[in-house]
Amino acid sequence: MPNSLSITDNRTGARYELPITDGTIKALDLRQIKADDRDFGVMAYDPGYLNTASTRSSVTYIDGDEGILRYRGYPIEQLAEHSTYLEVCYLLLHGDLPTKDQLETWVHDVTYHTFLHENMRRRFMDGFHHDAHPMGMMVSALAALSTFYPEAKNIEDPQNRNIQINRLISKTPTIAAMAYRASIGMPFVYPDNSLNYTENFLSMMWRVAEPHYEPHPV
């Protein structure tokens, strides 16, 4: 076999051929290597999974030595230069970049969920100590979303899953900005859905008293 690894067990003299796929062998293929019939089989020992791939992914490809990162086959540099954050989210979820009509629907569906229940701010976020770390506040708030949307537990319903995905993508910037501003003693800024996804996040983070926030163009 040209794409295989040949192993000779010096304990028994037995020889094994393990197929190599995409530069990897299956750990379970090692189980056939036994000293005798009572042997469980050879196991791979890799502390910290430093040289173990846990799964095959069609979403990302990473080659750290070569500096390669791809999402769904697209180089990350190309996506960073030519695509918006929400376009990349759509790509990761659906496998292809959205058409114009798909993007319009996708942006609408995400933007629809940017606001938080008032109790999330008044009864939950305001309950944190004044020097609580924003990351702890954010993680706690994300977990607390399940108490506001108990239907989210129905993971077998594809439509319901999509709604929860939309909620997470849309509400995470709102929660992150709210946690940050609370940590520095600044009042909460509501989402402004007239802005795009990134502009809205910057507005919620940095807006002070402007009637309408105008993000600095980069």
Enumerate the language-model features and the residues they cover.
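Hydrophobic alpha-helical bundle cores within soluble ligand-binding/oligomerization subdomains
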Residues: 2-218
